[in-house]
Amino acid sequence: MSTMTLSESNESKKIASLNKLFEGKQNVFYINDNFTIYDTAFYICRGGLPLSLVDDKNKALKITKNYCSTLFNFENSKNQKFKNKKPELFKIILKIYARNISTEARRKTILNDVCEHEDRTMDPDTFDSYIEALNDLYIIKDIKAWNPNFRSKTTIVSAPTRHFVDPSIATYVLGISPADLLNDPNTLKLLFEDFVVKELRTYLQLLDGEIRHYRDGNGLECDIDLHLAHGKYSLIEV
C-alpha cells in the first residue's frame, strides 16, 4: 500500500521513464524553470493522500493533518496487535522515528530516546510490538541494506535506513510546516530523501524490483539502490 506519486496526481513533468533508464534508452537533461524549493517542501508536508489533492494549499495541508490525527483511533479494533496499545506512546515512538528519518539509527538508539522522552523504562519486546504495529498500519517502511557481493570480505553495514510510507506523517508528528522546512535545510534534506524513496518505491513495484541502501566499512555509501529481479541495479545519491 502506498500513497499517490506526483505522476499519479499529474504534478510531475513525466519527463523520465524508470524503465527506459534501466534499458539505457533515455538520457534525461532537464532545467527546472518553474518549480521552487517551497513547492518541494509543500509536497513533502501534504503527502500523497487522494483527498488532499485540492487547489487550496492551506486546505490541502489541513486535510493531511486531519487524516494523520486519526491514525491511532482503533479503540474498537479486533486486531490483537492493536489492542491495549496506547495512542500517545505510538505518537512518541513516531516522533523519535521521524527525528531519525533517512538515517541508519539503531533500534536500541530509538528505544533509548523513547525511554528518555518518557522518563521511564520500556521493555524491548513491548517496543518491538509497537514497531510491528506501525509496519502493519503502513506508517513506517524501512529500507534494508544491499550487499552486491555475498562472498566479499568487505564489511557491509547491515542496519536499515529509517523511512515512512509517506513523509507527510513524519512532518505531522514533528509539527512542522513547509515554511519550517525552508528554515531548516538539514531536516528538509532528510525528509526530501524520504519523499524520493516513497516515489521510487511505488514506481519500482511496476518493474518487480526492490529498493535498498548501501554503505560499507570503508565509507562508501549510496542513499538508494534500485535493484531489479534480473540483476540490473541503479545507484542513486539524493
PLM region spans:
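Conserved small helical "lid"/interfacial subdomain of P-loop NTPases
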Residues: 2-23
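Active-site ExK catalytic segment of metal-dependent nucleases
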Residues: 232-238
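Accessory nucleic acid-recognition modules appended to NTPase machines
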Residues: 53-232
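Hydrophobic residues at beta-strand termini and immediately following loops
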Residues: 1-2, 214, 236
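Active-site donor-binding loop signature of nucleotide-sugar glycosyltransferases
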Residues: 3, 167, 238
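Residue-level signal for inorganic ion chemistry
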Residues: 9, 47, 223
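Amphipathic alpha-helical "lid/sensor" segments that cap RecA-like P-loop NTPase cores
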Residues: 23-70
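Glycine-centered loop/turn positions within well-structured domains
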Residues: 7, 50-51, 234
